[in-house]
Amino acid sequence: RDRSVSRGLGDVYKRQAQTTRHRIMGIVNTPEYQIVFSDTPGVLKPKYKLQESMLEFSEGALTDADVLIYVTDVVEDPEKNKDFLDRVAKESVPVLLVINKIDLVKSNEELEAIVDRWRKRLPNAEIFPTSAMEHFNVDNLKKRIVELLPPSPPFFGKDALTDKPMRFFVTEIIREKLLLNYDKEIPYSTEVLVEKFEEKEKSIHIMAVIYVERDSQKGILIGKGGEKIKKVGIQARQDIETFFDKKVYLELFVKVEKDWRNKENKLRQFGYLE
């Protein structure tokens, strides 16, 4: 079970790039060390109260971190997140800049130019050009992270994988399927809330509600004769079964909660506010 969940956590993290709304801790344990990775939402200028909360998650991680890892790629403009990067440039903790997707670069000269632009933007950072797809330079990055870890007793037990409850990853898997099956406006206007999670020895019964902001979005989400929401349910159920290594019974419902991204009571219910 632990091995299955660990593998599932890795899959969720890999597939959820650019879509994380919460601060998620992933824990790596070995006999020699424990690394607590704090994955935060992408940095953006807030348009809703939801995004204000997401920005607070990212800024909170800066305060807590012993090592700051800023992940970008070869196409991102170094001036995209100016205010945030200005703060990163002043950090006293070690900063590692990870430039991903270098497999897309056609020449060494092009890569050197990209690295040079980022070196000027974050002169305090160690730069690691990487390709997660080809696993290039990933081991060197991990080795450097371990070297920078301060001496400390472990924060979590040796069997811990994350600080989030397992039902949290059910919502993440369902949200991923929404992102894959609908145009941008729909998934970014949705929130998933697990209202029932009954785990038995060989099976799990889950009831989840997908919230949207408008009646028109509800119709699009459900689809003609319920075909689209059924497809989402099938895909999500299959991945949840892989995650838990158990038979899963998944029920999905769609509800309208107008302008939920600006309502503090709903943001609190969904875990974005305390």
What are these regions (language model features)?
Residues 166-274:
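P-loop NTP-binding site
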Residues 56-125:
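Conserved C-terminal guanine-recognition region of P-loop GTPase G domains, centered on the G4
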